[in-house]
Swiss-Prot record:
Keyword flag Ribonucleoprotein: no
Cystine connections: none
NCBIfam families from the UniProt entry: alaS
GO biological process: alanyl-tRNA aminoacylation; negative regulation of DNA-templated transcription
Compartments, as annotated in UniProt: Cytoplasm
Cofactor: Zn(2+)
Organism: Neorickettsia sennetsu (strain ATCC VR-367 / Miyayama) (Ehrlichia sennetsu)
Higher taxonomy: Bacteria, Pseudomonadati, Pseudomonadota, Alphaproteobacteria, Rickettsiales
Any Pfam family: tRNA_SAD
EC id: 6.1.1.7
Name the record gives this protein: Alanine--tRNA ligase
């Protein structure tokens, strides 16, 4: 039903001259005022202001929307009503000067009565009470008259984008679910209840609200309409409850099956809804975190976990239900398939990390609230302790106690939170200049923000506006009328250098910026002293430090760009450090990065560096810069104009210092990639000569390790050889021997197998007899080998040795040169060997 309804809507308007555009991301592309896309018109806001910028004059969309944070927040109602959702789809048709009120009403009426075949008896219309034109068009088209066309005077039927800008009256189509439900016909000060449900809102954008509050006619009036897909699907499926449509029933049924609990329908509704919003947010690059939209996603997942816990289910649930969502919505929203692994990994990690906190936190909450009764209020101090000490979120505390009709002192909680932040800020600033906040504010009121003139200037002149000396030390803090010293900002460490006056030399060690924009210089007195405010001083930055910071900052931009290119658009900065010696970059990514992928990332970075891209900076309007693709940090407060830094395709909003060309970075070497939190990874790297030095040291370390390894191998080989020698020596020594004595000379003969002649020769000194002659035989592959070893006395008888060699020769043996007291002989036949042994025995008898 969902897919069919969506397709029917799109096809109808395409057939009626509209261009279909796919849903935009849930993350507003160029609208820092919004946390999420929460209506179908959000992606087209700029076109209503200037229709000439619209790519098409009439458009139809099925837009993903989330309402779970900020002004539009349905989170707490989800699960307890029939129609509230954190995620929903808005079907819409839009006109940018193409058609207006009459055509918009005609198309809407034709679609609901002819395409959807809704009964006209069930339909009611509302118009803005002053919009006679809309009333007449509706009356002419439907014949309803005042009985079923109601004039509404409240702001509900007059829409405006903001305090100033495009606005106009609205008209709504309501559907009557029947008398069995409570509710009044939609009129002023009457509640339509559950009986009458708004299914389509038509906004006739025909005015511009001016600064004075006056309304001026738009030159090109526009149309913005929105139909809630889930509400209409419920009507077509014959129910007044969105959660009883087939899509939600499929998820709820699977939730019941997996948890084994079919009770507590509210819990299953929460889980089904939150699975949708969490999955689509992750698919659009949002990952759980502690600020902004990332924290809203975390709240959504944690709320689902809380309700799965209430069902008695204590393991990961949402990933086990995702396949149902993908099956029902994945054919139209293919990002669910593309980002499936990221969605499953993120849901799993977030659930696992919160379950322990939830279990212990609920136990503590039960302890502190056990004596409380309906109507009581939990103190902000206790709620804060649960959050600060035990990590138990305030919204979960509120949610749980709400079921028992116990409230929470959220103002008291906010006060404690504010106090903690102030203490933390004071702690961070304790080492900063002791300049009083009064003095900083006084400088700000008189002189404004400190002008920074250091992008191109490495030396300069300035006047001292304020001085604070740290009592009992040579430390002081100075405020200047302008500065070349870049203050610590955006993760980049500050410049250092010197400030020199007529009788003063100061070393600038740290530079900070106050919340007002006043720049403070922490200094150490090298010589002399600062005598008075108003003194003119010379400024000079440490150029080597500045260049190192610039190289590392530009390298960080390139790293960010390459990560988004290789890992996906979900990668966004979560923190950074730009120091002179290294850089550190934290980013959203749920999976570990393989060594192979890390090498490819490093290669891509260096290729961009060596492409010698010019580093270009320009000042732009913030909305224009973001629209043009510049990456900004969510939660960062930007002025109306921003500095845009471009390095090839890497474009970011940035106030930091950078190199002139990418090639000045020289080289990037990634040192490590690690995980610092769930869904957040960290890369640390070095550049330029530091990178080269690291590579050289690594090579030297490898060489040292190789040399050390070779030495160990040689030692092992020597040890093993000794062991082998001992084994062979034992074999020869213990081999069966035949001993014969001829006069004073003993001849020992041994026969061994499986030992080569080389090994036997190497054993000669170890097995040499103290007296007499040792003859060791072994069989080789093609011959018989004999090793004849003489004792020291016989060895001295040169003529005897010569006679032995001659005897071997006459017996058809071959003598091989060897060590002096050893004779090696090889025989091709055994009978030759036997004959030789007999002749040698006779030689011994005749000689000794």
């Amino acid at each position: 039903m969902i897919d069919g309804l969506r397709k029917k809507f799109i096809d109808f308007f395409v057939k009626n001259g509209h261009t279909y555009l796919p849903s935009a991301s849930l993350v507003p592309k160029d609208d820092p005022s919004l946390m999420f896309v929460n209506a179908g018109m959000v992606p087209f806001k700029e076109y209503f202001v200037d229709v000439r910028r619209a790519p098409f004059s009439s458009i139809v969309t099925a837009q993903k929307c989330v309402r779970a944070g900020g002004k539009h927040n349905d989170l707490e109602n989800v699960g307890f009503t029939k129609r509230h959702h954190t995620f929903f789809e808005m079907l819409g048709n839009f006109s940018f000067g193409c058609y207006f009120k009459e055509r918009a009403i005609e198309l809407a009426w034709k679609f609901v009565t002819e395409e959807l075949t809704l009964s006209k008896k069930k339909l009611y219309i509302t118009v803005y009470h002053e919009d006679d034109e809309a009333f007449e068009i509706w009356d002419k088209l439907t014949g309803f008259g005042e009985r079923k066309i109601k004039r509404i005077s409240t702001s509900d039927n007059f829409w405006q984008m903001g305090d100033i800008g495009p606005c106009g009256p609205c008209s709504e189509i309501f559907y009557d679910h029947g008398e069995h439900l409570s509710g009044d016909i939609p009129e002023d000060k009457k509640d339509p209840g559950e009986r009458y449900v708004e299914i389509w809102n038509l906004v006739f954008m025909q005015y511009i609200r001016e600064q004075s509050g006056e309304l001026a006619r738009m030159e090109c009036p526009c149309i913005d309409t929105g139909m809630g897909l889930e509400r209409v699907a419920a009507i077509l499926e014959g129910t007044d409850d969105n959660y009883k449509t087939k899509l939600f029933e499929a998820i709820v049924k699977e939730s019941q099956n997996v948890t084994g609990n079919k009770d507590n329908q509210a819990a299953h509704k929460v889980i089904a809804d939150h699975l949708r919003s969490a999955s689509f947010l992750i698919a659009d690059g949002v990952l759980p975190g502690n600020t902004g939209r990332e924290y809203v996603l975390r709240r959504i997942i944690r709320r689902a976990v809380r309700y799965s816990h209430a069902l008695g289910f204590d393991t990961v649930l949402l990933p086990k239900l995702f396949w149902v969502l993908k099956e029902w919505m994945g054919s139209h929203y293919q990002e669910l398939t593309r980002a499936e692994n990221l969605i499953l990994d993120t849901l799993t990690l977030e659930e696992q990390s919160f379950r322990n906190t939830l279990k212990s936190g609920m136990k503590l909450l039960e302890e502190v609230s056990s004596s409380m009764k309906e109507g009581d209020t939990l103190s902000g101090d206790i709620a804060f302790t649960l959050y600060d000490t035990h990590g138990f979120p305030l919204d979960i505390t509120v949610d749980i106690l709400k079921e028992r009709k116990i409230s929470v002192d959220e103002e008291g909680f906010a006060e404690r939170m504010k106090m903690q932040r102030l203490l933390a800020q004071a702690s961070r600033m304790k080492d900063m200049a002791q300049t009083s906040s009064y003095e900083v504010k006084a400088v700000f009121l008189e002189h404004g923000k400190t002008p920074f003139i250091g992008y191109e200037n490495f030396t300069g002149l300035a006047l001292i506006l304020a001085i604070t000396e740290k009592e009992g030390s040579n430390k002081l803090t100075i405020i200047l009328d302008q500065t070349i010293f870049y203050p610590e900002s955006g993760g980049q460490e500050s410049d250092q250098g010197i400030i020199e006056g007529e009788n003063t030399l100061l070393k600038v060690e740290k530079v900070y910026k106050s919340t007002e924009g006043v720049i403070l210089h922490e200094c150490t007195i090298i010589r002399g002293q600062v005598t008075s405010r108003g003194e003119k001083v010379n400024l000079k930055i440490d150029i080597n430090r500045r260049n190192s910071l610039a190289r590392n900052h530009s390298a960080t931009h390139i790293l960010h760009h390459v990560l988004r290119k290789r890992l996906g658009a979900h990668v966004s900065q979560r923190g950074s450090l730009v120091a002179p010696s290294r850089l550190r970059f934290d980013f959203s990514h749920s999976q570990s990065i393989t060594e192979e992928e890390l090498s490819k990332i490093e290669d891509c970075i260096n290729l961009m560096i060596w492409d010698d891209h010019p580093v270009m900076t320009e000042i732009k309007k913030t909305d224009e810069a973001i629209r043009d693709g510049a990456i900004g940090l969510f939660g960062e407060k930007y002025d109306d104009t921003v500095r845009v830094v471009s390095i090839g395709e890497a474009v970011e909003l940035c106030g930091g210092t950078h190199v002139k060309k990418s090639s000045a970075i020289g080289l990037v070497k990634i040192l490590s990639a690690s995980s610092v939190a769930h869904g957040v990874r960290r890369i640390e790297a070095v550049t330029h000569l530091t990178a080269l030095q690291y590579i050289r040291e690594a090579e030297q370390a490898q060489l040292y390790q190789l040399t050390e390894h070779q030495a160990k191998l040689k030692a092992m080989q020597k040890s093993h050889q000794k062991e082998i020698t001992r084994v062979y020596q034992s074999i020869v020594t213990n081999a069966e021997a035949r001993t014969e004595r001829y006069g004073s000379v003993e001849i020992i003969t041994k026969n061994v197998q499986g030992i080569s002649k080389e090994i036997l020769l190497s054993l000669a000194s170890e097995i040499r007899p103290k007296t007499g002659v040792l003859i060791v035989h072994t069989e080789l592959s093609e011959a018989l080998y004999s090793l004849i070893i003489l004792d020291k006395e016989i060895f001295k008888n040169i003529s005897f040795i010569d006679s032995m060699k001659e005897t071997i020769d006459k017996s058809h043996g071959k003598v091989t040169p060897s060590v002096p007291y050893v004779i090696q002989a090889t025989f091709s036949k055994k009978e030759d060997l036997d004959r030789c042994l007999k002749n040698l025995s006779e030689l011994v008898v005749s000689t000794f």
